[in-house]
Amino acid sequence: QAGQTAVITGAASGFGLEFSLQAAQRGLNVVMSDVQADALEAAVQRVRQAGATVLGCHGDIAQSAVVQTLLDRTLEQFGAPHLLFNNAGVAHGGLIWEHTERDWDWVLGVNLRGVAHGVRLFTPHMIKAAQAQPGWQGHIVNTASMAGLVCAPNMGVYNVTKHAVVALTETLQQDLCLVTDQVRASVLCPYFVPTGISHSHRNRPPELRSQGKPTPSQLIAQAMSEKAVSSGKVSASDVAAATFAAIEAQQFYIYSHPNALAPVQTRMEDVLMSRNPSDPFKDRPEIGQRLRAALRGDTPA
């Protein structure tokens, strides 16, 4: 509702920017956080031009102190937010045993700890606001991925973090239901949507950059990710609109491609039937054949 406040991480591009713009269109105050200072400044100006009161907060949400500052500044200017979008994320691929300790630290830091920091720090204030006002409503949206519901090969560390975000958010929803009727959660699981996530290495902190050259599997994963993301037909704006509709409907699982859930069903059937994981390429075997050949050194992917 107009006059309420939304906090959005990863707000300078992709889903985060669209969440910010559509929050502004709804008359909300908008708090925007991003690790890219120049992009954040431009995004803040764009959202401000849409008519919103905007607060920009630069920093890496993998660091708890950054999220604490984000909370403090939000409370100081607007009070407890009604909407929290823990949206910032990065992507990294390759064979799972080839991820370095720095790879794990970087991707876990942003994709999982960043979400955990947001939930840990903001949720108590949202619950407190709900307790003080019977009509107060709050909602937390955590951005996961279809990679949080299935396990595609050559995407190990990314899959791990996104599965963790789904588990975190399911637990958050269950825990909220124990203590309040006024704050709820949703998990966003987008498929391939044109955003900047396939180029997220541009924001990797210097101290967490990999030493040495990328492995062949990592180069293949990067190329496949860029191709898949850029070819997506559903826009970030479409996903943001679906997310706001889901918030209003108190819908927990949010999908960018609701007609592309067959792999999720197959995985659940594998689990229930104690069946070995199904071949993810069974419907497009030529892709699997090319990937196997490339990783075994027979031919390029």
Where in the sequence are the language-model features?
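Residue(s) in the substrate-gating loop at a strand-loop-helix junction
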Residues: 145
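Active-site helix of classical SDR
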Residues: 119, 161
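The beta1-alpha1 cofactor-binding region of Rossmann-like NAD(H)/NADP(H)-dependent oxidoreductases
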Residues: 37-38, 58-69, 101
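Canonical Rossmann dinucleotide-binding motif of NAD(H)/NADP(H)-dependent dehydrogenases/reductases
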Residues: 1-31
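SDR active-site lid
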Residues: 178-258
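Substrate-binding pocket helix/loop in short-chain dehydrogenase/reductase
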Residues: 95-96, 100-108
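Conserved glycine-rich Rossmann-like NAD(P)H-binding loop of the short-chain dehydrogenase/reductase
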Residues: 26-42
